[in-house]
């Protein structure tokens, strides 16, 4: 009977290989712990995954079946490194441009409006503490944004001078990407409190 045979085969496979099945969240810390327990590598990024292409085990495997030679694998790894570096470079420069030419000028303009509002409310003899607090918060985040922008500009420029390939792509991953995240943090906070009419681009809510 075909169905019986299939069920029997499935049962056999499940019994033999149950230990490799993980039904939890593969993106959670639970999987990180489980992978370590099983002796599996926890590769967190593309840059850290590329070297797997040129390990002795990979070279032997692809060579054994006539898929790729060692030189071909090394060439593919090099291309992946270069593509990654180019992609992050484009993203970093776009981020710098948006922050410098759109976000910071818009926030500067808004802080002036807030400052004028604080003065007007005080002159009217009313409590301007809320407006003053908003102004202080936004000014603080604006300072953080400018500092983060300078850092991103510096590391992006430094990355351009690195040796192309593995060295450069690793620098982009371990230095430029964190600097990008460092710029995004205060900008995200600003987006939550700056007047929507002033913000120069669609918000997460709009999207």
For every predicted segment, state its role.
Residues 1-5:
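Flexible, glycine/charged-enriched surface loops at secondary-structure junctions
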Residues 7-11:
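Single-stranded nucleic-acid nicking/binding segments centered on His-rich, glycine/basic loops
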Residues 12-207:
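C-terminal amphipathic alpha-helical interaction region
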